Structure formats: C-alpha cells, structure tokens
Amino acid sequence: MSQVTDMRSNSQGLSLTDSVYERLLSERIIFLGSEVNDEIANRLCAQILLLAAEDASKDISLYINSPGGSISAGMAIYDTMVLAPCDIATYAMGMAASMGEFLLAAGTKGKRYALPHARILMHQPLGGVTGSAADIAIQAEQFAVIKKEMFRLNAEFTGQPIERIEADSDRDRWFTAAEALEYGFVDHIITRAHVNGEAQ
C-alpha cells in the first residue's frame, strides 16, 4: 500500500460524515456539495492531486451540488482539473449553478453527466468592487478580463458560439437536465445503472 493511501486511510477520529467522504475518496469519488470558497477549493484541489498521483490512468468522478461562489476559488479547481493527467468525469445532482455550472461543463468531454432532476444555472460572473476610484477602475478592468475568459471557456465547453453564451448569460438562465444536454453542458443524462445520450 502506498504512503499516500496509508495517510488517507487513517480515519481515526473522523465523524460519520467524514468517514463516508473518505470511503468515497478511496473509490476516486469527490464532492462539491456547498458554495465554492477558498477552503472548499483547497480541499478539492488536494484531493484531485492526491488521486492523480496515486493513479494517473483512472478517472476521477466529481459530483456537483453547488450554488456557485468565488470565481478565484472556482478557477483554482478548474486549473487543477486541467493539470491532472487523468480524466475528470463530472456529475450534476440537485443544483449546479454559476461556478457549479462552469465546473460541470469543464469535465472531460464525453464524461459529463446530469442526474434527471438536476438544475443548471448559467449567468454572468458576479463581482463587487470597493475602494477608491482608482481601485474600483482597476478591479472593474480585471473583472471584465475574467468575465471574457469565462465566456470563452463556456463556449469551448459547450460548442456554442461565444455570442450566444454572452447573450444567454445576461440574465439568470436555468436549464433542466434535458436542456443542459441539448445546450452542451453535459453529454449524458444518467438514470440508475444506464446512461441516456438523448434528452428524455
């Protein structure tokens, strides 16, 4: 047994919930089940790196039930997904909103799934600006750059023209699992033990 597995398997003192997540981690399953923030991002990035180090040839499954959250934290997760040599299969369950939608669509093409009653929300990246007039101008400029990059990436993930991504993101837009499949956020709707490649 490898050192990293030994370290991960030491579950003494963990709560029942923690023990469940540790058991899932041993099966290469990780969860984003809350708002995306720096703490959550650090945990998910560490788990992805750990699993990739253990076996670069096996998929990692990322289940997402999230209202979204921090852009910088979400982009840290995304960059780690890209960095990992193994495929990252993503699953929408419950709600994949905002940054949750972005990470869902960022999964390995052909391995992006939605459960039948999942809801997906796409909208413009949100960011507040504070400080002096000069600081506000700098923050606004940086936010515009980030927003443009996220539009570009979402267009790449979905196969939609960037102009459509920009237009559809202008206001909150919700998608059912079937609509998300048609739009290109996911590749399959999964029900029980089988996968449906077409909207149902």
Curated annotation (Swiss-Prot):
The active site is at residues 98, 123. Keywords: Cytoplasm, Hydrolase, Protease, Serine protease. Its EC number is 3.4.21.92. One of its GO terms (biological process) is protein quality control for misfolded or incompletely synthesized proteins. It is an enzyme of class 3 (hydrolase). InterPro entries: ClpP, ClpP/crotonase-like_dom_sf, ClpP/TepA, ClpP_His_AS. Its main location: cytoplasm. Signal peptide: none annotated. Pfam families: CLP_protease. One of its GO terms (molecular function) is ATPase binding. It is found in: Cytoplasm. One of its GO terms (cellular component) is endopeptidase Clp complex. It catalyses: Hydrolysis of proteins to small peptides in the presence of ATP and magnesium. alpha-casein is the usual test substrate. In the absence of ATP, only oligopeptides shorter than five residues are hydrolyzed (such as succinyl-Leu-Tyr-|-NHMec, and Leu-Tyr-Leu-|-Tyr-Trp, in which cleavage of the -Tyr-|-Leu- and -Tyr-|-Trp bonds also occurs). Cleaves peptides in various proteins in a process that requires ATP hydrolysis. Has a chymotrypsin-like activity. Plays a major role in the degradation of misfolded proteins. Degrades anti-sigma-D factor (rsdA) when present in a complex with ClpP2 and ClpX. Does not seem to act on anti-sigma-L factor (rslA). Fourteen ClpP subunits assemble into 2 heptameric rings which stack back to back to give a disk-like structure with a central cavity, resembling the structure of eukaryotic proteasomes. Forms a complex with ClpP2 and ClpX. This is ATP-dependent Clp protease proteolytic subunit 1. It comes from Mycobacterium tuberculosis (strain ATCC 25618 / H37Rv). The lineage of its organism: Bacteria, Bacillati, Actinomycetota, Actinomycetes, Mycobacteriales.
